[in-house]
UniProtKB/Swiss-Prot annotation:
Record protein name field: Negative elongation factor E
Gene designation per UniProt: NELFE
Domain RRM span(s) in chain numbering: 262-332
Species whose genome carries this gene: Homo sapiens (Human)
GO CC annotations, alphabetized: chromatin; NELF complex; nuclear body; nucleoplasm; nucleus; plasma membrane
Organism domain of life: Eukaryota
Keyword annotations of the record: ADP-ribosylation, Chromosome, Coiled coil, Isopeptide bond, Nucleus, Phosphoprotein, Repeat, Repressor, RNA-binding, Transcription, Transcription regulation, Ubl conjugation
Compositionally biased residues, Low complexity: 30-43
Amino acid sequence: MLVIPPGLSEEEEALQKKFNKLKKKKKALLALKKQSSSSTTSQGGVKRSLSEQPVMDTATATEQAKQLVKSGAISAIKAETKNSGFKRSRTLEGKLKDPEKGPVPTFQPFQRSISADDDLQESSRRPQRKSLYESFVSSSDRLRELGPDGEEAEGPGAGDGPPRSFDWGYEERSGAHSSASPPRSRSRDRSHERNRDRDRDRERDRDRDRDRDRERDRDRDRDRDRDRERDRDRERDRDRDREGPFRRSDSFPERRAPRKGNTLYVYGEDMTPTLLRGAFSPFGNIIDLSMDPPRNCAFVTYEKMESADQAVAELNGTQVESVQLKVNIARKQPMLDAATGKSVWGSLAVQNSPKGCHRDKRTQIVYSDDVYKENLVDGF
């Protein structure tokens, strides 16, 4: 047996309420539909009446309208005076009409939804911006500018121009609020100190960079001076080699020991063997004398090296029988061993060599012209 409760349950009561609301809405909709249908029929009748009227020209219509206005049946239409300018946005017009409502909420896709309470909290959290004077002038500079009585101290050139006017009202306001909000003043002081520390660090870094650049420039100058000195030394060595009698080869740039030997190199124009023997025989026994007339030079070989050194010391740069002589020890010393007597075959080689004697021992054969003539006659 099913037991049905006498009253309705909560769900049934809620459904009944909804049903009643729907009925009321349906009745309202029907009433609105009736009103709209009646308005459309009236508009259609007006349109029909207007369409049934005869078509008139603009000139006749304007004359009829003027007569009606004069009679007072129709009032003249007043032209609206519109202010020419830029169009205002609808949101701005809404703000101007209802300033108490505040800004109309609009959908902004790239902005998080912020309520008015959150906006107020954020504005309270944000640090207040400093004035332009505070951002450039620190508190210590302001105290220096002020005198002991709180007045501006007179400095050099204070009376030359008009007095400077600073925003002291802001100072008074900040002093009044400082007692009420000490944490703000502390945060400002901390920010000032941080800014000063940053400026000091930047200045130190700049000074270090300048010192480094100066040291680099000094090192570069030193290197340049060293290179210049080296180049000068090289040039001096080259000049010395060029000025000397024989140029030193590039493969042996180091200093050489003085030459030693018994063979001399003699340079002079129009030299003769008799002149050379007469000039060089007083210093020692000459074992070889060879000449090279195309080059204006000769080679004189002594028996001893001491005599060669003495001849160089006394005859180099002198003039003998109007011939300027340049005497030096020869680079090549082929007769040194033979002259000193170290080898047995050396003396023989010197005696029989083509350079050993300046005169050829062979006899020259000379043919007369008569012999040629006789041979020609016999042939024909």
